[in-house]
A protein has these predicted regions:
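Structured beta-strand-rich core segments of catalytic domains in phosphoester-bond hydrolases
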Residues: 95-200, 208, 307
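N-terminal, active-site-proximal structural segment of metallo-dependent hydrolase catalytic domains
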Residues: 14-16, 26-119, 130-139, 144-149, ...
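N-terminal export and membrane-targeting signals
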Residues: 1-18
C-alpha cells in the first residue's frame, strides 16, 4: 500500500533530477461544462519526470439505509479513515445531491457524504453535484422519479482540474422495475489529474447501468458507446486513468452478464478508446469483477499498472464482514513523462 507522502516524495525526487523545466504552455481553464481546449493537449515537461501513485476505486454502497441491503449509516463512518492511505480515491454511490423535498431529504442519508470525508486529509476534492439542470436533465419532464445525484466523487493528494459530470443519455428501472437506475443520475465524471508540474492526465470515474435484462443490456452498450465518444472528443491524444463500477460482468458465468454480452461491451470499449484493463496488464486472476480500472498512455506521458488488488481484508467491520457490497480495488500506477 502506498501513501500519498511516499508517492509525493518519489515525484519530487524524480523531478529534481530532471534536466531543465521547459513546459508547454497550458491553455486557460474554463467552466465545468467545457474545458475542451485545456483537456485536449497534455502538458508535458521536457525534463524527464516519473513517479507512482495508488488509485482506489470504491462503490461505498451509500444508498439510503431505508432502501439499502447494506448498513451505510453504520459502515460509512468506518470506511472514511480507511481511505486515508491512498493517493487518489474514486467513489461511487457517494451521493451529495438529493431531490429537494424528496424522499431522501428527511433521512439520515443526507449526512453520509460528509461522514465519508470526515477522516481523510486529501487536499483536492470534487465539489457537490450541481443538480440535474446543470447537467441537462429536466427532472419533471425526463425523470420525475429521480431522487439522487450521480454518486461520483474524487479525493486526491494531487491537484485536480475542472470537473465535468455527464449523465447517461437514458436509463431503465424505477422503484418497482429493473435495477432502479432511473432513481439516480448515473453517468461519469471527467477531470484532470496533475502528476507533476506541467504533467497531467485525464481522470474518469463512472457508474454503469445495472441489471441483466434486455433493456439493461441495451443501455449498457449505449452507455459505453457514449463514454467512448466523449473520450474521443475531450481526451484525444491524452493519457487517461479511468475507474469505477462498470456493472459489466466479464466472467461469462454471471447471470447478469448477458451470455457474453458484457464481455463484448467491455472489449469494444477498450478497443475504441485505446485503454488497457489493469487486470489484463497485471495478469490478475479476477478479470470478471465489475469494479475495473483502465488506462492508456498519451501526450508524452507513459502509464503502467504495477499492481491490481482488491482490498477485501482491509475494508471490513469488527466481524470481518465487508463494509460495502463491493470490495475496493487498488491499482498502483507508475508514470513517466518527458
Amino acid at each position: 500500500m502506498h501513501t500519498g507522502a511516499r508517492a509525493g516524495s518519489r515525484v519530487a525526487a524524480a523531478v529534481a533530477l530532471g534536466v531543465g523545466a521547459l513546459v508547454l504552455a497550458a491553455c486557460s481553464r474554463s467552466s465545468a461544462g467545457g474545458g475542451d481546449a485545456e483537456r485536449s493537449t497534455t502538458s508535458a515537461a521536457s525534463a524527464e519526470a516519473s513517479g507512482e501513485l495508488s488509485l482506489l476505486s470504491y462503490n461505498v454502497a451509500g444508498l439510503p439505509q431505508e432502501i439499502s441491503k447494506e448498513h451505510p449509516s453504520v459502515n460509512i463512518p468506518k470506511i472514511s479513515p480507511l481511505l486515508e492511505p491512498f493517493d487518489v480515491v474514486l467513489t461511487q454511490e457517494d451521493f451529495d445531491w438529493w431531490k429537494p423535498g424528496g424522499l431522501a431529504e428527511t433521512t439520515d442519508f443526507v449526512h453520509y457524504h460528509e461522514r465519508l470525508r470526515a477522516d481523510v486529509t486529501h487536499e483536492f476534492r470534487t465539489e457537490r453535484h450541481p443538480g440535474p439542470e446543470a447537467v441537462g436533465i429536466d427532472i419533471d419532464a425526463d425523470r420525475p422519479n429521480m431522487e439522487l445525484g450521480d454518486g461520483l466523487g474524487v479525493l486526491s493528494r494531487l491537484p485536480i482540474g475542472d470537473v465535468d459530470r455527464v449523465p447517461w443519455t437514458r436509463c431503465f428501472g424505477e422503484f418497482d422495475s429493473g435495477a432502479s437506475d432511473c432513481l439516480a443520475m448515473k453517468g461519469f465524471l471527467h477531470t484532470t489529474l496533475e502528476l507533476a508540474d506541467g504533467v497531467s492526465v485525464d481522470l474518469y470515474d463512472l457508474h454503469g447501468e445495472a441489471g441483466g435484462g434486455p433493456e439493461d443490456q441495451a443501455l449498457q452498450a449505449d452507455d459505453f458507446e457514449q463514454l467512448a465518444a466523449y473520450i474521443a472528443d475531450h481526451s484525444e491524444g491524452r493519457a487517461i486513468l479511468l475507474a469505477g463500477d462498470t456493472n459489466l460482468h466479464t466472467d461469462l458465468e454471471h447471470e447478469d452478464g448477458g451470455d457474453g454480452a458484457d464481455v463484448e461491451i467491455w472489449r469494444t470499449f477498450l478497443e475504441a478508446t485505446g485503454l488497457t484493463d489493469s487486470c489484463t496488464a497485471t495478469d490478475c486472476d479476477d478479470e470478471g469483477r465489475i469494479d475495473k480500472v483502465a488506462f492508456r498512455s498519451g501526450g508524452g506521458v507513459e502509464l503502467e499498472a504495477r499492481s491490481h488488488e482488491f482490498q477485501g481484508g482491509t475494508f471490513v467491520d469488527e466481524q470481518g464482514e465487508d463494509l460495502s457490497d463491493h470490495q475496493p480495488l487498488e491499482v498502483v500506477i507508475g508514470w513517466r513523462a518527458g
